[in-house]
Regions:
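Electrostatic, structured charged patches in enzyme active sites and in nucleic-acid/phosphate-binding
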Residues: 1-275
Length: 275
C-alpha cells in the first residue's frame, strides 16, 4: 500500500479549504488535520463523542486525555479539535510583526496553516486551548509559535491558554476513559426497559450494601440470565450517563466496592449510536 503524502503544498491547502476542513460545528465539524495528515501517535476516539456525536481526531495521548475531560463536562456544548488559524496571511503577518519565522513544511518549504488543538464552546463562551507536555514549553521555537497563536486569538477576543499534563487529573481521566465507550450501550435497546430497570434496581441494592462491583455485576448477570459482562457494561453506562454517581476522583476498580455510590436519577433512554 502506498504511503499517504503528508507534506503540504499550496494546492493541498487550497483543496483542504474547499473540502470544508475547519468548518462546521458539532457533528458536522471537519477538523483541519486528521491522524493521516501528520506523523504522530494520533488516534481516533473509539466511540462517538458524547458532546458532538462524532469521532474525534486526536494527535497525541495528552490531547486524548484533555478531550475526555471536555467530553465529560456538562457545560461544554461543542468541541472542535485541530482548528485552523485562517486566513494563512494573518498568521504570516503576525509572525513578521513579532520577528519570528512562520511555521513551514520541512519538505516543501511553504508556510503551513497553524492550528489550535481545541476550540471549545463552554457555556456562552468560546475558549481556545493548546495542549502540550510541559517539557515543550522550554523550547524557544515552540514559545514563538504559541505567541503567534495567542495574538491571533486575542485579536478575536477569545480566551486562549495552554494545558499541560499537570492540569490533567489522571484518576478522573482514566475513569472517564473506562466508561466512555459505554455511553451508547447497544444492550440498552436490545434488552428493553423492563429488564434494564430490574437490573438497575438489583445492582443498585448490591452496590449500596458495599458489595464488590464485579461480584455484584456477575450476580445480576446470573440472576437475570444475561451474558457475562452485561451488567458491568451497564454499570459503566449508568456512570457515563450520570444516572449513577461514584467518586470519580479515585480510580474505579471493579474488584472493590464503588466508592460514594449514589443514584442521581433514573433517566434511561432506549437508544444506541454505536461504540
Amino acid at each position: 500500500m502506498a504511503k499517504r503524502k503528508r507534506q503540504f503544498t499550496e494546492a493541498k491547502i487550497e483543496r483542504m479549504i474547499k473540502e470544508g476542513r475547519g468548518q462546521g460545528s458539532g457533528k458536522d465539524y471537519l477538523p483541519w488535520l486528521t491522524i493521516q495528515d501528520v506523523p504522530s501517535e494520533g488516534r481516533v476516539t473509539r466511540g462517538v463523542g458524547w458532546t458532538t456525536g462524532r469521532r474525534h481526531q486526536l494527535l497525541s495521548d495528552i490531547e486524548r486525555d484533555y478531550f475526555y475531560l471536555l467530553d465529560y463536562c456538562d457545560d461544554v456544548s461543542d468541541i472542535r479539535e485541530q482548528f485552523p488559524l485562517l486566513p494563512l496571511e494573518e498568521t504570516q503577518m503576525i509572525a513578521e510583526k513579532i520577528g519570528v519565522e512562520h511555521p513551514k513544511d520541512p519538505k516543501t518549504g511553504i508556510s503551513i496553516v497553524m492550528t489550535t488543538d481545541f476550540l471549545i464552546t463552554y457555556r456562552d463562551k468560546t475558549l481556545a486551548r493548546t495542549v502540550k507536555p510541559s517539557a515543550e514549553l522550554e523550547n524557544e521555537r515552540t514559545i514563538a509559535k504559541f505567541e503567534i497563536e495567542r495574538i491571533y486569538w486575542d485579536s478575536r477576543h477569545v480566551d486562549w491558554g495552554i494545558i499541560t499534563e499537570s492540569d490533567l487529573p489522571d484518576a478522573l481521566i482514566r475513569n472517564i476513559e473506562w466508561v466512555h465507550k459505554e455511553f451508547h450501550n447497544e444492550d440498552v435497546p436490545a434488552l428493553g426497559i423492563f429488564t434494564i430497570r430490574n437490573l438497575q434496581q438489583m445492582l443498585s441494592a448490591r452496590l449500596h450494601n458495599g458489595e464488590v462491583v464485579s461480584r455484584a455485576c456477575l450476580a445480576c448477570d446470573e440472576q437475570l440470565g444475561l451474558d457475562a459482562g452485561t451488567s458491568l457494561a451497564l454499570f459503566r453506562h449508568f456512570i457515563a450517563r450520570k444516572i449513577w454517581s461514584v467518586d470519580m476522583t479515585e480510580r474505579i476498580i471493579p474488584t472493590l466496592p464503588a466508592k460514594d455510590f449514589s443514584e442521581k436519577h433514573s433517566d434511561i433512554r432506549l437508544e444506541a449510536k454505536g461504540g
